[in-house]
């Protein structure tokens, strides 16, 4: 028997649809990438940020090739809708990551959007000049697992105290 995750079964789809069609998806990704390069930190729904992350990383890889590389210039020209950001890609972002081979972005989940409860995320380029985001604590005492463990410990402590009390009264004879 083979266990598989339902999300891994794509039936020919290799990316999220995110919109009306393939052209709409590309326009959405281009606008998100442009915003990320301009502001170096944006927030959007989790699915869009997760889909855009690979393109943001690849754009930095092309930026590291330099503005004299024809393919890098074509990719920057295509993906950045605001052409004044092309020099920023080649002269600011690419030199920042010249010693890294990947992992240029950080993605954090933030509270859900209040209107439709959509799962939201923040994506940012690492090493930006913005104040750092607070990293979520993984092992909070409020998680379900930690609450269950705390209850188990209390039950064990109570049963040990009860058994100690009953064994203590059994050993001491009554007067």
From Swiss-Prot:
GO terms, biological process: mitochondrial translation
InterPro entries cross-referenced by the UniProt entry: Ribosomal_bL17 (IPR000456), Ribosomal_bL17_sf (IPR036373)
First-listed, main subcellular location of the protein, grouped into a coarse class: mitochondrion
Gene Ontology, cellular component aspect: mitochondrial inner membrane; mitochondrial large ribosomal subunit; mitochondrion
Domain of life: Eukaryota
Keyword Cytoplasm included in the entry's annotation: no
Keyword Mitochondrion: yes
Gene3D superfamilies: Ribosomal protein L17
Key words of the record: Mitochondrion, Ribonucleoprotein, Ribosomal protein, Transit peptide
Tissue: Detected in adrenal gland, mammary gland and adipose tissue.
Location(s) in or outside the cell: Mitochondrion
Region (Disordered): 155-175
Transit peptide residue numbers: 1-8
Positions with biased composition (Polar residues): 161-175
A GO MF label: protein domain specific binding
Subunit structure: Component of the mitochondrial large ribosomal subunit (mt-LSU). Mature mammalian 55S mitochondrial ribosomes consist of a small (28S) and a large (39S) subunit. The 28S small subunit contains a 12S ribosomal RNA (12S mt-rRNA) and 30 different proteins. The 39S large subunit contains a 16S rRNA (16S mt-rRNA), a copy of mitochondrial valine transfer RNA (mt-tRNA(Val)), which plays an integral structural role, and 52 different proteins.
Family of this protein: Belongs to the bacterial ribosomal protein bL17 family.
Protein name as annotated: Large ribosomal subunit protein bL17m
Record organism: Homo sapiens
């Amino acid at each position: 028997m083979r266990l598989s995750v339902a999300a891994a079964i794509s039936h020919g789809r290799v990316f999220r649809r995110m919109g009306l069609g393939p052209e709409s998806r590309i326009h959405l990704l281009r606008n998100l990438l442009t915003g990320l390069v301009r502001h170096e930190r944006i927030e959007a729904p989790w699915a869009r940020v997760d889909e855009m992350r690979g393109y943001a990383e690849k754009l930095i890889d092309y930026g590291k090739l330099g503005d004299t590389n024809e393919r890098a210039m074509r990719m920057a020209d295509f993906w950045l809708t605001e052409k004044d950001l092309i020099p920023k890609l080649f002269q600011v972002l690419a030199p920042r990551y010249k010693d890294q081979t990947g992992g240029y972005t950080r993605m954090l989940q933030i509270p859900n959007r209040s209107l439709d409860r959509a799962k939201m995320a923040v994506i940012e380029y690492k090493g930006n000049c913005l104040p750092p985001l607070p990293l979520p604590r993984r092992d909070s005492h409020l998680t379900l697992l930690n609450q269950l463990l705390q209850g188990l410990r209390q039950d064990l402590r109570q049963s040990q105290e009860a058994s100690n009390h009953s064994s203590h009264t059994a050993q001491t004879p009554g007067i």
